[in-house]
Regions:
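Conserved phosphate- and dinucleotide-binding cores of soluble alpha/beta proteins
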Residues: 2-14, 19, 23-27, 40-43, ...
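N-terminal active-site beta-alpha-beta segment that forms phosphate/nucleotide-binding
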Residues: 14, 22, 31, 55-178, ...
């Protein structure tokens, strides 16, 4: 009988709190109990199973995100539900745009990578002119095919959509020789842009699977058959803005190629305080690992 009465009191308090939306103080005033007693009663009701809290995790993967954060020592992971939209590139790009809008700080410089998913971010980003942002390319890419996916073009498009500014790196992403790269890197304008990108507060980039037929790198036309063969021979599975390639063990490979890339270096990218990497597609699994 005592237990039935206790349950009745606890249930009544819960009904007032959860269904009538009364505050703990209002319930205390109404019942003549102290606010502390109301707080303890609500907790006891949870412990007894009178109240069950159900969180709708549909489309969310918080536990998996937490595991990934712990395993790879990441600040934050966002997994986009593939069942939400048939066009996953747009879904990932819109999520990246929202993340930028929510996290960038005023007067920041954002280093920008290249790729097909990256090229769509500007389609979803909102005006941020009050933030006075600067978008700066991580790597060159001017004057080649698939212009819309190059870092300079993406930087420019992001600047236009946000009402902010961008820099242009008017050079190829990859040149034919290390000597040609050194000559370009000695150009005053190119040097200034690269130095500005090195000082970026954020980096927004994607990962590529260099050996996939329709990868951004293969579409760009920068690599010869010999270059593609080198990627295969050295087991490259991950393309980081074409300034670094990794094998399945996570080790740097294909230095002969990255020694010819015109942009910041892999160590420069590491030194940028906050890096935001967006990845989409099953073919990127090995690149992400």
């Amino acid at each position: 009988m005592k237990m039935d009465m206790q349950r009745r009191i606890l249930t009544t308090i819960c009904q007032m709190y959860y269904e009538q939306n009364l505050t703990q103080q209002q319930i205390a005033n109404k019942t003549g109990l102290t606010r502390m007693k109301i707080s303890r009663s609500l907790q006891k009701a949870k412990d007894m199973g009178i109240v069950r809290i159900i969180i709708d995790y549909s489309g969310l993967y918080l536990e998996l995100e937490s595991e990934i954060n712990s395993k790879y020592q990441l600040k934050e992971t966002i997994i986009v539900d593939s069942s939400m939209n048939n066009d996953m590139k747009n879904q990932v790009a819109s999520t990246a745009a929202y993340y930028l809008e929510s996290n960038l700080t005023k007067n920041s410089t954002i280093a920008i990578g290249w790729g097909s998913t990256m090229s769509r971010v500007s389609n979803f980003i909102q005006d941020m002119s009050n933030m006075k942002l600067l978008f700066s390319p991580i790597i060159g890419g001017h004057g080649k095919s698939e212009l819309d996916m190059h870092a300079t073009t993406i930087s420019s498009n992001l600047a236009k959509k946000t009402g902010c500014n961008s820099l242009s790196l008017l050079a190829p992403a990859l040149v034919k020789s290390k000597k040609e790269k050194e000559l370009l890197m000695d150009d005053t304008h190119i040097k200034e842009v690269i130095n500005q990108t090195k000082r970026a507060d954020y980096a927004l980039f994607s990962l590529g699977s260099p050996l996939v037929k329709d990868s951004s790198l293969s579409k760009s036309g920068y690599l010869s058959d010999d270059g593609l063969k080198q990627l295969k021979d050295e087991g490259a599975v991950c393309d980081i803005v074409s300034i670094a390639f990794l094998n399945k063990d996570g080790n740097i490979c294909c230095k002969n190629i990255t020694d010819r890339s015109v942009g910041i270096s892999e160590s420069d990218l590491k030194n940028i305080p906050l890096k935001i990497c967006i990845v989409e597609g099953e073919e990127k699994h090995d690149a992400v690992k």
